[in-house]
Amino acid sequence: MKQFPAIPSDIPHGDMPGDQVCIDDGHIRKAVVIYPRLRELMGEGAGRQVIAVCGGSGVGKSEIASILAYWLNREGVGTRVVSGDNYPRRIPRDNDLERLRVYRQGGLRGLVDRGLVTPEITARLRALWEEDRDAEPSSSADEEAWLAVYRRAGRRALTGYLGTPAEIDFDEVSGILARFHRGDDLFLRRMGREPSALWYDRAACAGTEALILEWTHGNSDYLEGVDIPILLNSTPAETLAHRRARNRDGTTDSAFTAMVLEIEQKKLEAQAHKARIILSKQGEILTWPEYRRLMADA
Protein backbone atom coordinates (compact mmCIF):
# COMPACT_ATOMS: atom_id res chain seq x y z
CA MET A 1 0.00 0.00 0.00
CA LYS A 2 1.90 3.05 -1.25
CA GLN A 3 -0.62 5.59 -0.02
CA PHE A 4 -2.61 5.16 3.16
CA PRO A 5 -6.36 5.80 2.83
CA ALA A 6 -7.79 8.73 4.77
CA ILE A 7 -9.48 7.80 8.03
CA PRO A 8 -13.23 8.61 8.07
CA SER A 9 -14.77 10.21 11.14
CA ASP A 10 -17.08 7.24 11.71
CA ILE A 11 -14.39 4.55 11.54
CA PRO A 12 -15.52 1.19 12.96
CA HIS A 13 -13.84 0.32 16.25
CA GLY A 14 -13.77 -2.28 19.02
CA ASP A 15 -16.72 -3.90 20.73
CA MET A 16 -16.51 -2.48 24.27
CA PRO A 17 -19.91 -0.94 25.13
CA GLY A 18 -19.68 2.83 25.53
CA ASP A 19 -16.09 2.98 24.29
CA GLN A 20 -15.12 6.31 22.72
CA VAL A 21 -12.41 6.28 20.05
CA CYS A 22 -10.94 9.70 19.24
CA ILE A 23 -8.36 9.37 16.47
CA ASP A 24 -5.84 12.17 16.03
CA ASP A 25 -2.84 12.75 13.75
CA GLY A 26 -0.51 11.16 16.29
CA HIS A 27 -2.40 7.86 16.16
CA ILE A 28 -2.35 7.90 12.36
CA ARG A 29 1.41 8.60 12.24
CA LYS A 30 2.08 5.65 14.53
CA ALA A 31 -0.19 3.36 12.51
CA VAL A 32 1.69 4.40 9.35
CA VAL A 33 4.92 3.20 10.99
CA ILE A 34 3.43 -0.07 12.24
CA TYR A 35 1.43 -1.10 9.18
CA PRO A 36 4.21 -2.05 6.71
CA ARG A 37 5.99 -4.16 9.32
CA LEU A 38 2.69 -5.76 10.31
CA ARG A 39 2.00 -6.74 6.71
CA GLU A 40 5.46 -8.31 6.49
CA LEU A 41 4.83 -10.40 9.59
CA MET A 42 1.38 -11.41 8.39
CA GLY A 43 2.96 -12.54 5.13
CA GLU A 44 5.18 -14.93 7.07
CA GLY A 45 2.16 -16.69 8.60
CA ALA A 46 -0.63 -18.80 7.18
CA GLY A 47 -4.34 -19.04 7.81
CA ARG A 48 -6.26 -16.77 10.14
CA GLN A 49 -4.05 -14.57 12.30
CA VAL A 50 -4.55 -12.87 15.65
CA ILE A 51 -2.86 -9.51 16.21
CA ALA A 52 -2.71 -8.08 19.73
CA VAL A 53 -2.30 -4.33 20.23
CA CYS A 54 -1.25 -3.92 23.84
CA GLY A 55 0.28 -1.31 26.13
CA GLY A 56 -0.39 0.78 29.20
CA SER A 57 -2.75 3.64 29.91
CA GLY A 58 -3.08 6.33 27.27
CA VAL A 59 -0.94 4.80 24.51
CA GLY A 60 -3.78 4.72 21.96
CA LYS A 61 -4.52 1.00 21.77
CA SER A 62 -8.15 1.39 20.69
CA GLU A 63 -7.41 4.10 18.13
CA ILE A 64 -4.42 2.40 16.51
CA ALA A 65 -6.17 -0.99 16.44
CA SER A 66 -9.12 0.66 14.65
CA ILE A 67 -6.84 2.27 12.06
CA LEU A 68 -4.94 -0.95 11.36
CA ALA A 69 -8.21 -2.86 10.97
CA TYR A 70 -9.59 -0.21 8.63
CA TRP A 71 -6.54 -0.37 6.37
CA LEU A 72 -6.50 -4.18 6.36
CA ASN A 73 -10.16 -4.26 5.39
CA ARG A 74 -9.49 -1.73 2.62
CA GLU A 75 -6.81 -4.09 1.27
CA GLY A 76 -9.27 -6.97 1.24
CA VAL A 77 -8.11 -8.62 4.46
CA GLY A 78 -11.31 -9.11 6.43
CA THR A 79 -10.53 -7.90 9.94
CA ARG A 80 -12.45 -7.65 13.22
CA VAL A 81 -11.44 -5.70 16.35
CA VAL A 82 -12.17 -7.29 19.73
CA SER A 83 -11.67 -5.53 23.06
CA GLY A 84 -10.20 -7.56 25.90
CA ASP A 85 -11.79 -5.15 28.37
CA ASN A 86 -15.00 -7.17 28.08
CA TYR A 87 -13.46 -10.10 29.97
CA PRO A 88 -12.72 -9.14 33.58
CA ARG A 89 -14.58 -11.21 36.15
CA ARG A 90 -16.29 -8.11 37.58
CA ILE A 91 -17.82 -4.95 36.13
CA PRO A 92 -15.46 -1.94 36.33
CA ARG A 93 -16.91 -0.50 39.54
CA ASP A 94 -16.80 -3.83 41.35
CA ASN A 95 -13.33 -4.60 40.03
CA ASP A 96 -12.04 -1.27 41.33
CA LEU A 97 -13.46 -2.15 44.74
CA GLU A 98 -11.92 -5.62 44.59
CA ARG A 99 -8.50 -4.17 43.77
CA LEU A 100 -8.78 -1.93 46.81
CA ARG A 101 -9.99 -4.80 48.99
CA VAL A 102 -7.05 -7.00 47.90
CA TYR A 103 -4.59 -4.19 48.62
CA ARG A 104 -6.02 -3.39 52.04
CA GLN A 105 -6.42 -7.01 53.10
CA GLY A 106 -2.83 -7.67 52.04
CA GLY A 107 -1.63 -4.62 53.93
CA LEU A 108 -3.45 -5.69 57.09
CA ARG A 109 -1.95 -9.17 56.87
CA GLY A 110 1.47 -7.57 56.58
CA LEU A 111 0.90 -5.65 59.81
CA VAL A 112 -0.35 -8.80 61.54
CA ASP A 113 2.67 -10.81 60.40
CA ARG A 114 4.99 -8.16 61.82
CA GLY A 115 3.07 -7.88 65.08
CA LEU A 116 2.25 -4.23 64.44
CA VAL A 117 -1.50 -4.29 65.08
CA THR A 118 -2.57 -2.02 67.95
CA PRO A 119 -5.83 -0.19 68.68
CA GLU A 120 -4.10 3.10 67.82
CA ILE A 121 -2.81 1.86 64.46
CA THR A 122 -6.18 0.29 63.65
CA ALA A 123 -7.97 3.57 64.35
CA ARG A 124 -5.47 5.58 62.32
CA LEU A 125 -5.64 3.17 59.40
CA ARG A 126 -9.43 3.35 59.39
CA ALA A 127 -9.18 7.13 59.15
CA LEU A 128 -6.75 6.83 56.23
CA TRP A 129 -9.16 4.44 54.50
CA GLU A 130 -12.00 6.91 54.83
CA GLU A 131 -9.78 9.58 53.25
CA ASP A 132 -8.41 7.17 50.57
CA ARG A 133 -4.89 8.03 51.69
CA ASP A 134 -3.57 4.65 52.84
CA ALA A 135 -1.39 4.27 49.73
CA GLU A 136 0.41 7.57 50.43
CA PRO A 137 3.62 8.02 52.46
CA SER A 138 3.16 9.76 55.81
CA SER A 139 4.92 12.94 56.91
CA SER A 140 5.15 11.46 60.42
CA ALA A 141 8.21 9.25 60.93
CA ASP A 142 6.46 7.13 63.56
CA GLU A 143 3.42 6.59 61.36
CA GLU A 144 5.52 5.93 58.25
CA ALA A 145 7.38 3.13 60.06
CA TRP A 146 4.29 0.91 60.17
CA LEU A 147 2.54 2.40 57.13
CA ALA A 148 5.51 1.44 54.91
CA VAL A 149 5.09 -2.18 56.05
CA TYR A 150 1.37 -1.95 55.22
CA ARG A 151 2.02 -0.48 51.76
CA ARG A 152 4.66 -3.06 50.82
CA ALA A 153 2.43 -5.96 51.84
CA GLY A 154 -0.58 -4.42 50.11
CA ARG A 155 1.37 -3.86 46.92
CA ARG A 156 2.57 -7.47 46.99
CA ALA A 157 -1.02 -8.70 47.30
CA LEU A 158 -2.22 -6.34 44.55
CA THR A 159 0.55 -7.56 42.23
CA GLY A 160 -0.78 -11.08 42.71
CA TYR A 161 -4.23 -9.95 41.55
CA LEU A 162 -3.76 -7.44 38.74
CA GLY A 163 -3.63 -8.97 35.27
CA THR A 164 -4.00 -12.53 36.57
CA PRO A 165 -6.78 -15.12 36.20
CA ALA A 166 -8.12 -13.92 39.55
CA GLU A 167 -9.04 -10.63 37.85
CA ILE A 168 -9.55 -11.66 34.22
CA ASP A 169 -11.05 -14.68 32.44
CA PHE A 170 -8.05 -15.42 30.23
CA ASP A 171 -9.40 -18.90 29.44
CA GLU A 172 -12.47 -17.39 27.78
CA VAL A 173 -10.35 -15.04 25.66
CA SER A 174 -7.98 -17.86 24.69
CA GLY A 175 -11.02 -19.94 23.75
CA ILE A 176 -12.29 -17.18 21.47
CA LEU A 177 -8.92 -16.98 19.73
CA ALA A 178 -8.88 -20.77 19.30
CA ARG A 179 -12.36 -20.70 17.74
CA PHE A 180 -11.26 -17.92 15.42
CA HIS A 181 -8.23 -19.92 14.27
CA ARG A 182 -10.53 -22.87 13.52
CA GLY A 183 -13.00 -20.66 11.66
CA ASP A 184 -15.86 -21.34 14.08
CA ASP A 185 -18.45 -18.71 14.93
CA LEU A 186 -17.47 -16.53 17.88
CA PHE A 187 -19.55 -15.71 20.93
CA LEU A 188 -18.26 -12.33 22.05
CA ARG A 189 -18.95 -11.00 25.49
CA ARG A 190 -20.20 -7.46 26.07
CA MET A 191 -19.75 -5.92 29.51
CA GLY A 192 -21.06 -2.51 30.46
CA ARG A 193 -20.82 -0.68 33.77
CA GLU A 194 -23.89 -2.13 35.47
CA PRO A 195 -24.52 -5.76 36.51
CA SER A 196 -27.41 -5.99 34.04
CA ALA A 197 -25.24 -4.79 31.14
CA LEU A 198 -23.86 -8.21 30.23
CA TRP A 199 -24.62 -10.18 27.08
CA TYR A 200 -23.08 -12.11 24.18
CA ASP A 201 -23.19 -11.44 20.46
CA ARG A 202 -22.62 -14.14 17.87
CA ALA A 203 -20.10 -13.27 15.16
CA ALA A 204 -19.45 -15.34 12.05
CA CYS A 205 -15.83 -15.89 11.00
CA ALA A 206 -16.62 -16.34 7.32
CA GLY A 207 -14.59 -13.80 5.36
CA THR A 208 -12.57 -12.73 8.40
CA GLU A 209 -8.85 -13.43 8.09
CA ALA A 210 -7.47 -11.29 10.92
CA LEU A 211 -8.64 -10.54 14.43
CA ILE A 212 -7.13 -7.59 16.29
CA LEU A 213 -7.30 -7.89 20.06
CA GLU A 214 -6.84 -4.46 21.64
CA TRP A 215 -6.04 -4.90 25.29
CA THR A 216 -3.53 -4.02 27.97
CA HIS A 217 -3.03 -7.75 28.61
CA GLY A 218 -2.79 -8.86 24.97
CA ASN A 219 0.80 -10.09 25.46
CA SER A 220 0.16 -11.82 28.79
CA ASP A 221 1.66 -15.21 29.61
CA TYR A 222 -1.84 -16.30 30.63
CA LEU A 223 -3.16 -15.77 27.09
CA GLU A 224 -2.88 -18.29 24.24
CA GLY A 225 -3.50 -17.85 20.53
CA VAL A 226 -1.87 -14.50 19.66
CA ASP A 227 0.29 -14.63 16.52
CA ILE A 228 1.60 -11.05 16.35
CA PRO A 229 1.82 -9.08 19.60
CA ILE A 230 2.37 -5.33 19.10
CA LEU A 231 3.53 -3.35 22.14
CA LEU A 232 2.77 0.37 22.20
CA ASN A 233 5.37 1.39 24.72
CA SER A 234 5.33 4.24 27.19
CA THR A 235 7.85 4.90 29.95
CA PRO A 236 6.51 5.61 33.46
CA ALA A 237 7.36 9.31 33.04
CA GLU A 238 5.51 9.46 29.70
CA THR A 239 2.46 7.75 31.20
CA LEU A 240 2.44 10.18 34.14
CA ALA A 241 2.75 13.18 31.81
CA HIS A 242 -0.13 11.91 29.65
CA ARG A 243 -2.45 11.34 32.60
CA ARG A 244 -1.55 14.68 34.16
CA ALA A 245 -2.29 16.45 30.87
CA ARG A 246 -5.60 14.60 30.55
CA ASN A 247 -6.78 15.83 33.96
CA ARG A 248 -8.24 19.29 33.47
CA ASP A 249 -6.74 20.67 36.67
CA GLY A 250 -3.31 19.23 35.96
CA THR A 251 -3.36 17.05 39.06
CA THR A 252 -1.87 13.57 39.24
CA ASP A 253 -3.68 10.33 39.97
CA SER A 254 -4.31 9.16 43.50
CA ALA A 255 -1.47 7.22 45.10
CA PHE A 256 -3.47 4.00 44.75
CA THR A 257 -4.19 4.55 41.04
CA ALA A 258 -0.52 5.38 40.48
CA MET A 259 0.40 2.11 42.20
CA VAL A 260 -1.94 0.14 39.92
CA LEU A 261 -0.38 1.76 36.84
CA GLU A 262 3.15 1.07 38.09
CA ILE A 263 2.36 -2.60 38.65
CA GLU A 264 0.77 -2.90 35.19
CA GLN A 265 3.84 -1.20 33.68
CA LYS A 266 6.17 -3.72 35.33
CA LYS A 267 4.11 -6.59 33.97
CA LEU A 268 4.16 -5.13 30.46
CA GLU A 269 7.95 -4.83 30.69
CA ALA A 270 8.28 -8.44 31.83
CA GLN A 271 6.28 -9.62 28.79
CA ALA A 272 7.83 -7.25 26.23
CA HIS A 273 10.39 -9.76 24.95
CA LYS A 274 7.55 -11.63 23.20
CA ALA A 275 6.36 -8.62 21.17
CA ARG A 276 6.95 -8.83 17.41
CA ILE A 277 6.69 -5.04 17.08
CA ILE A 278 7.61 -2.52 19.79
CA LEU A 279 6.68 1.10 19.11
CA SER A 280 7.98 3.95 21.24
CA LYS A 281 5.80 6.81 22.46
CA GLN A 282 7.54 8.93 19.81
CA GLY A 283 6.39 6.55 17.05
CA GLU A 284 9.64 4.69 16.34
CA ILE A 285 9.98 0.93 16.03
CA LEU A 286 12.42 -0.32 18.66
CA THR A 287 14.61 -3.38 18.58
CA TRP A 288 14.71 -5.46 21.75
CA PRO A 289 18.12 -4.02 22.80
CA GLU A 290 16.86 -0.48 22.13
CA TYR A 291 13.78 -1.15 24.24
CA ARG A 292 15.91 -2.52 27.09
CA ARG A 293 18.14 0.56 27.05
CA LEU A 294 15.15 2.92 26.96
CA MET A 295 13.46 1.31 29.93
CA ALA A 296 16.72 1.04 31.89
CA ASP A 297 17.18 4.80 31.53
CA ALA A 298 13.54 5.60 32.31
Tell where the protein language model's regions lie, with residue ranges.
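Walker A (P-loop) phosphate-binding loop of P-loop NTPases
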Residues: G58
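NTP-dependent small-molecule kinase module
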Residues: K2-E44, I228-L231, A241-D249, Q265-A298
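Post-Walker A helix-loop "phosphate-sensing" segment adjacent to the P-loop in P-loop NTPases
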Residues: Y70-R80
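ATP-dependent NMP and nucleoside kinases share a basic, alpha-helical "lid"
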Residues: D142, W146, L198-R246
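Conserved lysine of the Walker
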Residues: K61
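A glycine- and Lys/Arg-enriched "phosphate-lid" helix/loop adjacent to the NTP-binding pocket
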Residues: V102-Q105, R156-L162, L223-L268, L294-D297
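Conserved nucleotide-sensing/catalytic segment adjacent to the nucleotide-binding pocket
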Residues: T79-R80, Y87-P195
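Hydrophobic positions on the alpha1 helix immediately C-terminal to the Walker A/P-loop
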Residues: I64, L68
